[in-house]
Design a protein with these regions (language model features):
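Short, structural beta-strand-to-alpha-helix junction motif
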Residues: 16-20, 335, 499
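Catalytic alpha/large subunits of respiratory electron-transfer oxidoreductases
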Residues: 90, 94, 147, 154, ...
Length: 598
């Protein structure tokens, strides 16, 4: 259908509202209660427009677009009514923008400057929730904080919990001037999706403990579009990088937020992917390769350089049956590139079909029965990809990986040398206590672990090779839908840690199996050639990885549904094409090149 907005003819799908039509066309109408991922409420009243042949002003968010409709967004009566609504919204709003976590990315700030009155006429005491009865700044559950004085009662949080989460834990209580959002007996919000409440809140009423007083948007100089690898959904995300003083090296991860993808995660993500990222820069990160002194489990792990680590790896594998006797236990956190290289190594070593096992963690994640955003129980991003590449991904009736036969061969002493690749967070590979016990008992003579963290497994290892996490490398994964997605590099691996494809290239070189690759893009090109008949992988060699975008441009271009709001803030910037992609082959990454070890 066709309608006219401010003299422009717009063609939109039937069923869309006037506000949706205006947003798609880049016509500026303010809104607070409307969110593209939630139902219509029409409570904030700031989206008032004038529609020809209608006697009163209408809310654009709740008025369906009609054939031949003529809409005006800037007539004097619209401007006056809109400014009056803003004045009412700001009457009791505290002037604490300098200490509010929403500052710098707050629609209330932006719209007030653009559409609100220039000054307040309020001469009476403001309504303040403070101390007696109802408190203003309170804990709002394990992950959130609530400041009731900032709330404008848009009901986005109420609708999110009811419509998306499936458990209506938040409601508006009291009435009139005393209206407030609250939970039953002030218990706060307990949900796997609670962090999304900060995203939907258009003011600083709901904030997260994780980001509280931590940073400002302008302190995060770059943002990288990537994906979350903490479960098999593969939510599309943005990693915000915080600048450090000059004496600190590079940027650091400030927060993870969801990125809109209607086919994967819509506008949302779970709290696991949002908040459980601190291990990436935590104290347990492996910074150097480690080799245990002596040939027994009783020796101490000593730091060594990469050349010594790989030389000793080759020596100890040779002393325990040679490379043909080596077996692999691989986490389903391994990327397509890493699995492909492991397959190449296994082929070069002559490993039998039962010489490799893939493992992952499965855990219950309680959610309401009617939730619209189900968090999968599998804590791994690439189970589907591992199966596509020919690795064993059989499961038991409970969905656990079926590694029983492989486990028996290790526990019985048939396996003398085991290589464990675990690039995910602690515990994500599943139960490996049997590996630790086999090494301690001496039934397993050699344990080599490659990963980013010091865990109980790495403490039991004879050789530890430090790798990178998913935010420290360009890598491809296939989620449970069979969708190929790219995780882009946001950080550089710390210390001597290397991207895992580099480690495999040099491990192969040390063991006499040449893998002639100079970048992860080079590996992807080979995977695409070998799996060209599989529809999923046809675009693998052209898969694009986002490079860090300047923060202003990211704010301007990140959320297609609300992109124009940032144009109001950054009118002096040139237009940004939201491609944010480059050909990864144009950014060569050099592997550590070692001389062949005799």
């Amino acid at each position: 259908m066709t309608l006219t907005v401010d003299g422009r003819q717009l063609t939109v799908e039937k069923g869309k509202t006037v506000l949706q039509a205006a947003i798609e066309a880049g016509i500026k109408i303010p809104y607070y209660c409307y969110h593209p991922g939630l139902g219509i409420d029409g409570s904030c009243r700031v989206c008032l427009v004038k529609i020809e042949k209608m006697p009163k002003l209408q809310t654009a968010c709740s008025t369906p677009a009609g054939e031949g409709m003529v809409v005006m967004t800037g007539t004097p009566d619209v401007v006056e009514a809109r400014a009056s609504v803003f004045e009412f919204l700001l009457i009791n709003h505290p002037l604490d923008c300098p200490v509010c976590d929403k500052g710098g990315e707050c629609p209330l700030q932006d719209f007030s400057y653009s559409f609100g009155p220039n000054e307040s006429r309020m001469e009476f005491p403001r309504r303040v929730f403070d101390g007696e009865g109802v408190k203003a700044d309170v804990d709002f559950g394990p992950t959130l904080m609530l400041n009731r004085n900032r709330c404008i009662l848009c009901t986005r949080c109420v609708r999110f919990m009811s419509e998306v989460d499936g458990d209506a834990q938040i409601n508006i209580t009291d009435r009139g001037n005393g209206s407030q959002i609250a939970t039953f007996q002030e218990e706060g919000v307990h949900s796997l999706l609670s962090g999304n409440l900060m995203d939907v809140c258009p003011v600083g009423a709901i904030t997260t403990r994780d980001y509280r007083f931590k940073s400002r948007p302008w302190d995060n100089p770059d943002a990288v579009d990537s994906i979350c690898t903490f479960c098999e959904r593969g939510c599309n995300t943005t990693a915000w990088l915080k600048a450090k003083p000059e004496w600190a090296r590079g940027a650091r991860l400030a927060r993870i937020t969801p990125r809109y993808n209607p086919d994967v995660n819509d506008y949302w993500m779970c709290d696991i992917g949002r908040f459980d990222y601190h291990w990436i820069e935590g104290d347990d990160r492996l910074l150097r390769a480690l080799v245990r002194s002596g040939d027994t489990a009783g020796g101490e792990l000593q730091p060594v350089d990469w050349h010594d680590a790989l030389a000793k790896t080759a020596d100890r594998i040779e002393a325990n049956g040679g490379r043909g006797a080596l077996r692999f236990l691989i986490s389903a956190h391994a990327s397509i590139e890493e699995l492909f290289l492991l397959g190449r190594l296994g082929g070069a070593f002559g490993l039998p079909e039962d010489g490799v096992a893939v493992s992952w963690r499965v855990r219950e994640k309680p959610q309401p029965a009617h939730t619209k955003f189900k968090v999968p129980p599998v804590d791994a991003p690439n189970v589907r990809g591992a199966g596509d590449l020919g690795f064993p991904t059989r499961t038991t009736s409970s969905g656990e990986p079926d590694t029983a036969a492989f486990r028996r061969s290790v526990e019985s002493g048939q396996v003398k040398a085991l290589f464990v690749f675990d690039p995910g967070p602690a515990g994500s590979i599943g139960d490996v206590s049997w590996v630790i016990e086999a090494r301690k008992s001496g039934k397993l003579a050699l344990l080599i672990v490659q990963g980013p963290l010091m865990t109980d497994l790495t403490r039991a290892a004879d050789i530890v090779l430090p790798g990178a996490c998913s935010y420290e490398k360009d890598a491809a994964y296939v989620n449970y839908q069979g969708r190929l997605q790219a995780a882009a590099k946001a950080l550089t691996a710390p210390g001597d840690a290397q991207e895992d494809w580099q480690v495999f290239v040099n491990l192969g070189l040390a063991l006499g199996a040449t893998l002639d690759y100079t970048s992860s893009a080079h590996v992807r090109a080979d995977v695409a050639r070998e799996l060209g008949g599989n529809e999923t992988y046809k675009g693998l060699s052209d898969l694009a990885f986002a490079r860090p975008l300047p923060a202003k441009h990211w704010l301007q271009a990140s959320n297609p549904s609300e992109r124009w709001k940032w144009d109001v803030m950054f009118q002096d910037l040139p237009p940004v094409k939201f491609e944010g992609r480059v050909d990864p082959s144009s950014i060569p990454v050099q592997a550590i090149r070692l001389q062949k070890i005799d």
